[in-house]
Amino acid sequence: MAPKKGVKVASKKKPEKVTNPLFERRPKQFGIGGALPPKKDLSRYIKWPKSIRLQRQKRILKQRLKVPPALNQFTKTLDKNLATSLFKILLKYRPEDKAAKKERLLNKAQAEAEGKPAESKKPIVVKYGLNHVTYLIEQNKAQLVVIAHDVDPIELVVWLPALCRKMEVPYCIVKGKSRLGAVVHQKTAAALCLTTVKNEDKLEFSKILEAIKANFNDKYEEYRKKWGGGIMGSKSQAKTKAKERVIAKEAAQRMN
């Protein structure tokens, strides 16, 4: 059988829009003294306070310059879901604040005055302070070390992942020294450490440890070789691409 010929369907003509000749089209002129320009992001032209200006410059420099692997590993932080479950456990083991300590000491003093035996059981709490955390890692007492990604100067903690790996202690890098500080009633904290957990939390804690080991301890060799930075700005990238196009064009002409 011969193929059927397609029947052409007549395209519908769109009705022409009737414009009133009294209303003239006047395209906007956005030059000086002209119409107001459309709204756009002008944040790069704002005169920021010095502290914010330094933050912005530091961020740009980290993108432009080549960042060595030891520093670049602090850009690889724990993912949001795992960080949420980790902080839930850390908050369970917060150290006592001033009010709780005062109440405990008062109760202890009252018990001693009444001749009752005072409770001498040591509570399980999160350990903090860089020297204390380092000592616990060296003594192999630490079960998990949590390091902040934005410690300033970074030299304070840059060696800590290597020490944790050498002592085979699970470690992770999380966002926010202030978030770590909030756990231990401080403004900021460079590193936190857990030495043990209660029996009811052991199952959940072991799952978190497995995930952290897979993300950090097992990938240490990979992070040790990976440099960061070297990303140029949009203008610089455009110039480079234009140069490459010219070079490619000249090479093609020579070949012909």
Swiss-Prot record:
Q: Which SUPFAM superfamilies match?
A: L30e-like
In residue numbers, the region (Disordered) covers 1-20
Q: Name one Pfam family in it.
A: Ribosomal_L7Ae
Write out the GO biological process terms. Answer: ribosome biogenesis
Q: Which GO molecular-function terms appear in the entry?
A: mRNA binding; structural constituent of ribosome
Composition bias of kind Basic residues appears in 1-15
Q: Does the keyword Ribosomal protein apply?
A: yes
Which InterPro entries does the record cross-reference, listed alphabetically?
Answer: eL8/uL1-like (IPR050257), Ribosomal_eL30-like_sf (IPR029064), Ribosomal_eL8-like_CS (IPR004037), Ribosomal_eL8/eL30/eS12/Gad45 (IPR004038), Ribosomal_eL8/Nhp2 (IPR018492), Ribosomal_eL8_euk (IPR001921)
GO CC terms on record? cytosol; cytosolic large ribosomal subunit; cytosolic ribosome; plant-type vacuole
Alphabetically sorted, this entry's keywords are:
Ribonucleoprotein, Ribosomal protein
- UniProt family annotation: Belongs to the eukaryotic ribosomal protein eL8 family.
PANTHER family, A to Z: RIBOSOMAL PROTEIN L7AE FAMILY MEMBER
Q: What is this protein called?
A: Large ribosomal subunit protein eL8y
- Record organism: Arabidopsis thaliana (Mouse-ear cress)
The lineage, from the top, is:
Eukaryota, Viridiplantae, Streptophyta, Embryophyta, Tracheophyta
Q: Which gene encodes it?
A: RPL7AB
